[in-house]
């Protein structure tokens, strides 16, 4: 842009396109005395810089000039950024719906993923469109200056919330592997929501200094007309607190979780191979279902038993979940690391580095980081069957899973042992009463028959007696 404004040869090369676009040449009609501008006037306007000393690069930064000189480039950029925005919003809305409606997905880890989807969705709604607008305006801030600090605050807030959620998920999974009894006993829906609130509170606290100081001093959020963090202290401290420290915790806990799962799987396989019998903890009450679930992961019983098979299955499920989360962690790190590393380099080698190159890299890397918010729903779709089936139904506007007729047949063919003993006793009493009533009716009918036969025989005997007496 600066080259086009400063070099006369570059400006004269654009006259061919100006001669072909009569409608666009009217943009310069205000600079001439005549009502309509012709091609020679346009040529003189671009070349005769001596007679027009007030012409500068600032005049070339108007929206009409930008749309004329960079029409093709800006349209491609707008198209790519619009695709990222649509994928981010639509995909994360599907994740929120899936966790809210599917009972299979309602657990602590998926609640964290739903909150992460909310952060990514808000990033697509509030931050990405404004960033796309700045691209169209040549990375100049086109909105009121007070909104610049608010926009940077939202950008840092949602990006920090994303990595804080991933860090919290990694810690939660590690605690669940290391201490399953304590984790299962104290891990409820309420506790999960409290952890999510804590994550959002930390994210707000980290990003709050930006609007506090940025609204008071515009120089902290403006640099040469562009809306960005211009304070080196903000850049350094914010990068380490909001990204590098949580990243270190997330990576360490994730690898410790993988190591613990491998160790547990090795122990379980060795127990199955050697058929070693360990303590059975038979003193536990059979009616305590929660206690049984708590010890399924930490107790290995006789090989071939139901508990041993289920322990191995639980380890396999944990490994699959860690695989999916590992892919999410890896993509987030790969997509955001270039931006934060370049951001730190811009502060450290401020004098020796080329600011134009650093600025261009930051503009590209920030959108690669935004792309991670759109990738997460795709990962869930590829590696989780429940998410995949839920997304396909939601796209078809089917928000409830269709029940198969076989399920109704199974409900109607429940064996008698599935009922409670009290229900069986009541049924037996009812049947015994009906049998007794039937027996009484039968007995009464027999009695009536006997009575009728006795009366008939009595009548006959009376008749005989009467006849005898008469004789």
Curated annotation (Swiss-Prot):
Serotonin binds at residues 155, 343. A motif (DRY motif) lies at residues 172-174. Changing residue 151 to A/F: Decreased ability to bind serotonin and psilocybin. One of its GO terms (biological process) is positive regulation of inflammatory response. The record marks 229 as: Hydrophobic barrier that decreases the speed of ligand binding and dissociation. A motif (PDZ-binding) lies at residues 469-471. G-protein coupled receptor for 5-hydroxytryptamine (serotonin). Also functions as a receptor for various drugs and psychoactive substances, including mescaline, psilocybin, 1-(2,5-dimethoxy-4-iodophenyl)-2-aminopropane (DOI) and lysergic acid diethylamide (LSD). Ligand binding causes a conformation change that triggers signaling via guanine nucleotide-binding proteins (G proteins) and modulates the activity of downstream effectors. The PDZ domain-binding motif is involved in the interaction with PATJ, CASK, APBA1, DLG1 and DLG4. Binds lysergic acid diethylamine (LSD) in the orthosteric pocket. Bound LSD dissociates extremely slowly, with a residence time of about 221 minutes at 37 degrees Celsius. Interacts (via C-terminus) with MPDZ and PATJ. May interact (via C-terminus) with MPP3, PRDX6, DLG4, DLG1, CASK, APBA1 and MAGI2. Interacts with GRM2 and DRD2; this may affect signaling. This is 5-hydroxytryptamine receptor 2A. It comes from Homo sapiens (Human).
């Amino acid at each position: 842009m600066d080259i086009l404004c400063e070099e006369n040869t570059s400006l004269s090369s654009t006259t061919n396109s100006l001669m072909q676009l009569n409608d666009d040449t009217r943009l310069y009609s205000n600079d001439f005395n005549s009502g309509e501008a012709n091609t020679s006037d346009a040529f003189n306007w671009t070349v005769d810089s001596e007679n027009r000393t007030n012409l500068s690069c600032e005049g070339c930064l108007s929206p009409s000039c930008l749309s004329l000189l960079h029409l093709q480039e800006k349209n491609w950029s707008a198209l790519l950024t619009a695709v990222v925005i649509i994928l981010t919003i639509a995909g994360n809305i599907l994740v929120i719906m899936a966790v809210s409606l599917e009972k299979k997905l309602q657990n602590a880890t998926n609640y964290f993923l739903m909150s992460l989807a909310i952060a990514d969705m808000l990033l697509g709604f509030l931050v990405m469109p404004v960033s796309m607008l700045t691209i169209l305006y040549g990375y100049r801030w086109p909105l009121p200056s007070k909104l610049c600090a608010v926009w940077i605050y939202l950008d840092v807030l949602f990006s920090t919330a994303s990595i804080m959620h991933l860090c919290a998920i990694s810690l939660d999974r590690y605690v669940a592997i290391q201490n399953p009894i304590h984790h299962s006993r104290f891990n409820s829906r309420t506790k999960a929501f409290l952890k999510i609130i804590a994550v959002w509170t930390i994210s707000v606290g980290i990003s709050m200094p930006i609007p506090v100081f940025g609204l008071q001093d515009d120089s902290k959020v403006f640099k040469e007309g562009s809306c960005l963090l211009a304070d080196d202290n903000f850049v350094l401290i914010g990068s380490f607190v909001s990204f590098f420290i949580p990243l270190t915790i997330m990576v360490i806990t994730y690898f410790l979780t993988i190591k613990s799962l491998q160790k547990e799987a090795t122990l379980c396989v060795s127990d199955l191979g050697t058929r070693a019998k360990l303590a059975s903890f038979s003193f536990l009450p059979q009616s305590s279902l929660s206690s049984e679930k708590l010890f399924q992961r930490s107790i290995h019983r006789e090989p071939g038993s139901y508990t041993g098979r289920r322990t191995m299955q639980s380890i396999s499920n944990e490994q699959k979940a860690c695989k999916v989360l590992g892919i999410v962690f890896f993509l987030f790190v790969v997509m955001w690391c270039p931006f934060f590393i370049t951001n730190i380099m811009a502060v450290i080698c401020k004098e020796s580095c080329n600011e134009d190159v650093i600025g261009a890299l930051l503009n590209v890397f920030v959108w690669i980081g935004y792309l991670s918010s759109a990738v997460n729903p795709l990962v869930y779709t590829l590696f989780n069957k429940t998410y995949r089936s839920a997304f396909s139904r939601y796209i078809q506007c089917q928000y409830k899973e269709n029940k198969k007729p076989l399920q109704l047949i199974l409900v109607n063919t429940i064996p008698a042992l599935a009922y409670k003993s009290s229900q069986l006793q009541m049924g037996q009493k009812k049947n015994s009463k009906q049998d007794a009533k039937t027996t009484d009716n039968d007995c009464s009918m027999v009695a009536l028959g006997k009575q009728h036969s006795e009366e008939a025989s009595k009548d006959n005997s009376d008749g005989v007696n009467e006849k005898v007496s008469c004789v």
